[in-house]
Regions:
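N-terminal Rossmann-like NAD(P)+-binding domain of SDR-like oxidoreductases, especially those catalyzing
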Residues: 1-120
Length: 120
């Protein structure tokens, strides 16, 4: 089955993409990588280093022999999402894309607006 996982760089999306790939599904991750920008802006890092998405996908292929496609795109970009759906033709869409950063949204009004705009 062809499956798109949005938010595939995140806490829930990444392991879900791995699980689905391991089960034999054709997985495409869609992520805008905004979580990494927010963490950098907040000066917040993971307790354990997290490799960039492209590197993690390469390691997954090395250990499993399975490919996971990656599309860097914002779900609020209609043209990008339309192209991805046209190209991939998924049979399922697993949606984990979200801002999970309350501290980011409380910096000021502009950050709160951006958090809500991009929290599809």
């Amino acid at each position: 089955m062809k499956i798109v996982v949005s938010g595939g760089d995140g806490f829930c999306g990444w392991p879900t993409a791995l699980y689905l790939s391991q089960k034999g599904h054709d997985v495409t991750i869609v992520d805008n990588l905004v979580r990494r920008d927010i963490d950098e802006e907040l000066g917040s890092n993971s307790v354990t280093p997290i490799l960039p998405l492209e590197e993690r996908v390469a390691v997954w292929k090395e250990v499993s022999g399975k490919d996971i496609a990656v599309e860097i795109a914002d779900l609020t970009d209609y043209d990008a999402v339309s192209r991805i759906f046209r190209d991939v033709q998924p049979e399922a869409f697993v949606h984990f894309a979200e801002h999970r950063s309350a501290p980011y949204s409380m910096i000021d009004r502009e950050h709160a607006i951006e958090n809500n705009r991009n929290n599809v």
